[in-house]
Every structure is written in C-alpha cells, then in structure tokens.
C-alpha cells in the first residue's frame, strides 16, 4: 500500500484542537505530545473497558509494549509515533513489516511528525489498510452517535445519518419532450433514497438508462456482422447545422397536490459513491430516463431529447418542473425535501449523461462527476470516417444499444401498445447512423456535447483510464480541453480500463469527492482545493502525481525509417476466420509481429512523459481506390506493468456504519511482455479532415496525418517503443478481406510524441 492523500485540508492548531475535542478526544493545547497521544490512542479502543490491556498488546518499539512506554518518562519520538500510527491504521508488526521507518518511507506516509495536535488530526483523516479513513472507521464503531444531522471533520461530512430509516419513494417527473409522439409529455420514473430529516438536503443524481433493467436478448439479435467491404465513398463535403436544445416552458399548474409519494420500493441497484454520501446527508436519486421500464417515451440514445428529460429532474428538485405520484397523472408532488443543489455521478453511459447535463447549464447542477463518459457519440462508434466498434464489443452500434436500453418493452402491455411505432423509429435510427460509410453527419452532430462546452457552469470532475478502449480517452480529452478556462475542472487519469475507481486502496477519491461536495452542495467553507490533473504513474505501483494539464504542445519527432514497406490487407480464409472468431488471437499475433503489419521498433534516447496525442505523419499509397490505416504504439519489454482491471482485495470498505460494504480494489502491478500506449484508425478518404471526403487514386502517394488516442505515459531513456501499422483491426474496424496493399514511405514519415 502507498499513501496518496489529496483530500486532507491543512488546518491551524486551534482548529485541530476544536475538531478533536468535538469528537470526544480529550486532548489539550497545554498537554505534552506524549500525553495527547496516549489520550488519543486510548480513545481509539472504543470496545475496551480496560484500555491498559489493549495498550499492552501493541508495541512502541521492538523491545517495549505501548503501555510500558506510556508509563515511562521517555518522550514521544517520530519513530514511536510512526510505529503506533501504523498499528492504528491496521498494519501488524512482524507480519506487514519489520522495520517501521523503512515501511513508512516506502508507503509515502503523509504525516511529518512534530508532536502537534495536527499530527493526530491528520492521522484521523488518513486511510487505514482496509481503505477507510481512521475517522470513518471509528465513526462506524459509534465514536459519535447517529444524529441525522451534519457533523463535519476536516471539511468533510461524517456518517451520522441513519441509513436504516431512509425515505424510499418513487415519483414521475414530467419532461419537456414527447419522444413517442403520443401527444403527452413523457414521464420518467425517479427512484429516491433520502435521509429522514426535516431540513432540505442536496442530491446525488445518477442518470442511468440501465437502472430499471435491459433487453439483452433483443439487442444481441441486432448485433452487426463486422465482415464486409470497405466502401468507396463519393467525394464531397459534409454540411451540418447546430442542434437546438431549448425546451418549452414547463407547465407548473398543480393537480390535486399531495405531500407524500404513493409508491415505495424495497431495493434498487445503487452506486457506492452515492451510498457513501447518503450516509453523510446527501440524497441519492436514480433516473432511467425516456424509453425505460416504467417510464414513457422512446429511447433516443444520446440526443438532447434524452438529456432534457434528465434535466427535468433537476428542474423538479428546484421547483421548475412537475412530478406526479404515479403515471396516472392524478396528483402532483413537489420536492419540498430538496435544497435544489445537485451533483451527477456514474460511469460510462451514466458519465455520458453527466457530460451532457453539464452542457445544458441547468441551475442547481453545482457539480458533475463524469466517469469514463462519452463526450461525442461519433467518437464512441466511429473514427475518422470509419466504423470503429468500442473495445470488446465488435458489431455493437447505437441501434443495438438503443434496443438494449429500451426496457419499456419488457412490460408486455407497453410492448403491445407501442412496439409497432418503436420499431419504425428504430429502423429510422438504424438508417441515420449510416453504417455503410462511417461518416460524421447530422445524427452524430446532434449527439456531440463538446460543441456546447462553453455553456457548462458546474464544477466538473472527470475520471478516465488510459486503457479504456471502450469509451476511449479522446472523449475526456476533448471535453476537458473545451471547457471554459475560468471553470473549475479536475481529472483523475488512471491506468485502468473502463472501471470505477472510488474503491481503490491507493487514492482517497471518495474522500476528495466528499470535501468537494460539502463545499459545492452544502456550502461549507472548507478551503478545499483539488489539483487540476491527478495522474497515476504507469511506472510504479500505487503512485499518483499532480500535473498541470492534459495535452502538451512540445513534440519529440522520430523518423520511421529509410525505405518503403507494405501492408497486405488480405489473409488466408482460415486465418481470417480465426481472427474473426477470436479477436484477441489477432491482437496477440499483431503485437508479436505475426500479423499483416509494418512493425517498427525504436529505443528512446531520452526520458519523456507523453502527454497528449501521439501524431503520425505518413506518406502512403494504396494499390486500390480505397483503404484504411490502423496504428498502435506499445512499450515493449518483459517487466512489470499496471494491469488494466482492478483486482479485489478484501471486503473491507464501509460506506457508512456497516452500510453497503464493498471490496477494496487496486490495479495489480504484474509482469508482462508489453503495454499498449495508444492506438488509432483512419479511412484514407478522410485524410484531410472529418468533414472532407476525397478520392483515393490507386498507387498515388498521399500524405496523411493521424492523431492517436490521447494519453499520459512516462518512459525512460533506453525504453523500447513499438509502432505497428496495419489495415483491418479485428476488434474495432470493418473486417474487409479484399486483396490490396497499403505502402508506406518510411523515409517520408514520422511519429511525434507530445510532452
């Protein structure tokens, strides 16, 4: 374990004293460091009447138990403090460590001992081996009572709300859209978990089309075949118009108003970051949206109709939209329990809706936590004029996702009433996505949130993984860079895949969100400042660093070679079939120079930290009137790399007081032969830009530029890079087995590493 503490807020000795005393620690500004430490440690043993016995079972140094130390006249030293602090944090001498000084240094222990109360204050805010901070562990053990009111420590809310006596209610919010065109504004189901209190509370809202269930069997039937010809597209320019996202004014006329919801629920799937804050006084709201189980409308999949329907829930929390107690629309109900302040949460589609909601500039949305979210749907399903499936899902497209999330059809009565109209709508959508050509068009433009980044007012927190080939890093990169310069924004850029990071051992992400939520939603003047970019170092285990930005302008140029080389697109049928059935076998062969590719190896002559988009400038020609080029950059070398999927450790992370416990996780640091750094794909007809389609003349040289997926990746002098240039990618692109070649003039081609 390593400590990476970004949530602690430095305080004055007076504040440290006041907060420690308020929690029942009998410390004094006049007492010695040793006396205060003894009082602190004795308080830790909440379940012991005889704390002497507990102290006797701990040690102050290899020769002295802790009780004997406190009874002696020896002063408290950094060594004793450190050894006892380790035991307080759950580490066991002679098991987890033998040399406490070396162990503390290896773990980057964040507290510099000076004997002050600030040391004890920071120790409470430090994570234990279980993943909980020491103060959260003690509160879960009833250090302070459940009060159903806010208690803050170090600018963060503690788990003082009763999660056994929550309000669990359902309302149906009236949206400003009629997506199924039945003449009625669509209602969306809102599932609410909130503390049982008599004062207004803020809310964490998760907009998830998956929340009420999915229609996987129907979606699987629509999965597209990836085998086919790369078509020649007519040359020309693509024209677009700016989407209109203005909603009509809401009708706020009450109808037989009531103050109590009539629908309850026993269980719903939740996000543990929401659970963590629910125990700390923030309501948790889940909204599936239009076209989902027990909501109305059709699934419009990423357009601003879908977004405005989610926005209506935030409007309802602020008195600007109506909600009904049931879909019969007989009684309206107001959110009289809500303060109106909201943060959105969730990963993938959920993070996508966070991005989209932020661009509406809706009042009340104070903060957005967008985890691995899409910022432009074209960049999820397409790339540079090509069909490019999200990693791990070849053959998926927006029509299959629409079918997957249209859970309204799981209700047989709804299926009976609406399926015919829905299928007509889905057929139209399937045409609009244009799988034939892979070009950007108005359909995709209507689902590009980046163009409205200037409307964002909320504080934005992003998380994204360098190994996320599902929602690829271009999505966070372009949104992060497009936001107004005056806006407060933050990015946690880790080395995982498409994964949550709130339960990781190495970083206090949820505590950082607690501090920020208290500041933005509860109005707590805690002085908390979160760095702009927090990056997980790819060369070390559990190591995080602060960076100034994502994307740098400096570039190191690497000439690709001195000759020409060719890529054969065609495979023998047996190999082509094998790769199509198991794309991982293609990747294995590709990276080991066993597939159709140009493989180029380079040894770095300097240390470099890639930060941004690796750029390829290639001089190429195709033997036919079409073609595509794919590229991947890898670090080669048999050594330890961070694996992309977090491994569970133990079921030790508590989100309240024995509430919604979950497994602690971390990216394993494992031996491997290589690590993919970045990748990219380009249709040669889109070599100029995304909106320009040009002819490809057979055997005529072209200069193309290809920006690969953005990343942050550290390399040392002597490290070996491998650039692989190829055509068909069996995981991502159309599988065209035509017999043509792409030739690259390596002497006129280069790779630029941004740093």
Curated annotation (Swiss-Prot):
GO CC annotation: cytoplasm
Reaction catalysed by this enzyme: Hydrolyzes Xaa-Pro-|- bonds to release unblocked, N-terminal dipeptides from substrates including Ala-Pro-|-p-nitroanilide and (sequentially) Tyr-Pro-|-Phe-Pro-|-Gly-Pro-|-Ile
Keywords: Aminopeptidase, Cytoplasm, Hydrolase, Protease, Serine protease
Primary enzyme class: hydrolase
Active site per database record: 348 (charge relay system), 468 (charge relay system), 498 (charge relay system)
GO molecular function: aminopeptidase activity; dipeptidyl-peptidase activity; serine-type peptidase activity
InterPro entries per UniProt: AB_hydrolase_fold (IPR029058), Galactose-bd-like_sf (IPR008979), Pept_S15_Xpro (IPR008252), PepX_N_dom (IPR015251), PepX_N_dom_sf (IPR036313), Xaa-Pro-like_dom (IPR000383), Xaa-Pro_dipept_C (IPR013736)
Principal cellular location given in the protein's record: cytoplasm
EC number: 3.4.14.11
Subcellular localization(s) per the UniProt record: Cytoplasm
HAMAP family: Aminopeptidase_S15
Function: Removes N-terminal dipeptides sequentially from polypeptides having unsubstituted N-termini provided that the penultimate residue is proline.
Name of the molecule in the record: Xaa-Pro dipeptidyl-peptidase
